[in-house]
């Protein structure tokens, strides 16, 4: 058999085995009747799903999974999840699902990340085949949930400023004051403790002087973020 060396099969004394290129036994049937055509076809089909995890097919399926969830298509998302599971790649599927929960659902449904994490944990405790159930639950939840990418957009905008050299000194009133001599250095002298004020908020500057007025976070149009925006507009004024 190509790729696995010599294989000595004595019909009637060993189980029938179908070997694939990676030398892994995919189909075995007890008895002396040999391998049927159906056995070989099934083994070949499953072998084709065992893609190179460092190759294009691996990333294509993960990409299609995330884009299907992002596009709110639960049927397509289930299809690509099934392809990953049938290829034996539950780990990559689970990792990508954790990313999707924060990147694509995000603040539109903040509880989603915790639910997906719980489903992923359950999947690893159960193992396949039962693991498919909580993973499917998580995929359907994300595909049918409201979407927001405001978190990834916000952090990427902040990182872009840092990488461009726009950082600046931390305002003195925000610096650590737990050590002796901190106040002599002017640290924390004018800090206002928000919990001492109505609605637990007081106007003060938090960004470095060089970034004064920078806005990284933009409220998404979903119900959850708009509720937060409305709440703070009543307290701070229009954002």
Regions found by a protein language model. Name each.
Residues 42-51, 103, 144:
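Conserved alpha/beta core segments of nucleic-acid transaction machinery
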Residues 12, 23-27, 31, 135:
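Conserved AAA+ ATPase small/helical "lid" subdomain
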């Amino acid at each position: 058999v190509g790729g696995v060396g010599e294989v000595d099969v004595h019909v009637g004394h060993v189980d029938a085995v179908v070997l694939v290129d990676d030398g892994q036994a995919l189909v075995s049937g007890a008895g002396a009747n040999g391998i049927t055509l159906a056995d070989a076809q099934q083994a070949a089909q499953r072998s084709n799903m065992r893609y190179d995890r460092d190759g294009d097919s691996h990333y294509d399926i993960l990409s299609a999974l995330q884009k299907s969830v992002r596009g709110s298509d639960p049927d397509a998302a289930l299809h690509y999840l099934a392809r990953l599971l049938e290829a034996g790649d539950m780990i990559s599927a689970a990792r990508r699902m954790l990313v999707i929960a924060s990147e694509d659902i995000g603040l539109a449904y903040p509880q989603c990340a915790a639910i997906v994490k719980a489903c992923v944990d359950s999947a690893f405790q159960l193992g396949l085949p039962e693991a498919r159930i909580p993973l499917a639950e998580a995929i359907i939840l994300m595909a049918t949930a409201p979407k927001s990418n405001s978190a990834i957009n916000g952090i990427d905008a902040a990182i872009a400023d840092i990488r461009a050299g726009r950082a600046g000194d931390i305002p003195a009133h925000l610096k650590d004051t737990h050590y002796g001599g901190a106040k002599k250095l002017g640290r924390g002298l004018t800090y206002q403790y928000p919990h001492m004020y109505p609605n637990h908020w007081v106007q003060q500057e938090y960004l470095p002087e060089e970034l004064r007025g920078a806005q990284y976070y933009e409220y998404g149009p979903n119900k959850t973020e708009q509720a937060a925006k409305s709440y703070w507009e009543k307290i701070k004024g229009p954002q």
